[in-house]
Amino acid sequence: MSIDLSDLSDLTSKFSARNYAPLPVVVASAEGAWVTDVDGRRYLDMLAAYSALNFGHRHPRLIAATIRQLERVTLVSRAFDHDQFGPFCAELADLADMDMVLPMNTGAEAVETSIKVARKWGYTVRGVPVDQALIMVFGGNFHGRTTTIVSFSDDPDAHDEFGPYTPGFISVPYGDLTAVSDVFGGPLGSRVVAVLVEPIQGEAGVIVPPAGFLAGVRSLCTANGALMIADEIQSGLGRTGYTFACQAEDVVPDAYLLGKALGGGIMPVSAMVSSRDVLGVLRPGQHGSTFGGNPLACAIAREVIAMLRDGSYQRRSAALGTVMLDRLSALPTAVVSDVHGRGLWAGVTFRLAPGRAVCEALAREGVLAKETHGSTIRLAPPLIITEEELDWGLSRIESVAAEL
């Protein structure tokens, strides 16, 4: 029995909690950089599930890896080992030039994991008094929507009316090295065990920090004996033209937090990747996940890692990203107030229309994007997009901008 668009929308409205306000597109199938709705209309996906689809929809290599594993075993709890787990951990550690991996499922779980690990490291390695550890975060951050994470968010939608809030965090302005230094040099500085930072703030509108900021954070963390934890859940795995966005400043953090693209757009796969000194503080029973590191997730993630090995996706992101950012930067300044991004990742802030209206207009033109923070839209095309497809999408964006 077929169900038409209005019926599907009615079912969503009636039975789904209203924690999302989706654009009026109901996807039925997808391949590569394109999705098709229930009425057979095609759209160029220039959002790629916030970087979860770096390799596009249903990439043949990832589908093949999934099918191979589906035919063998999909889940065993961490009470037992399996033949995909060790190789996955070794290969991801090697890709990140780190020692150890702690796999989870969602990005928020990886962030929560890092908070627990940083605190325990602070107590057992640094000697910070128990229950006194602090973690420095940044204004405009987005690290997830769990209770602890929203406690240090300054986004009213994410934060307000979800208290009481988890203590133990200090927030400073993003990109402000002086503020970071002042915290370390102030009365609470000796309690700061980690700095949690997005190399580029995605949810905030793809905000790129000032040149030298990440290197400065790295230097201050080293000087003050604190961990630098890089949340690369959106920015990592090729999105910015590098395997990791931190590499743009030759910065190596103490830990990477990875997710989204690590699951190939098929499974939720996330991980904290760090040194033995850091992850080695955990003992059996102190952290875990029934599904984290399951055979199917590991098999898919191993194929993702293999696809990133030769750097071709990273180079493609850098090259096509230059084209995209150049075209977007040429949009009329009377219409667009700011364009920012790196690689195939951009935020475009409009003067004359809310971001939602722009995204609805783009959807009518066959392009999928998503608004954030009022008048900004986010663009994150899959890294497999062709030059012709990118040109087609950018032409539609230019057309919509011209009509505003």
Language-model features: locations:
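Conserved N-terminal phosphate-binding loop of PLP-dependent enzymes in the Aspartate aminotransferase
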Residues: 1-404
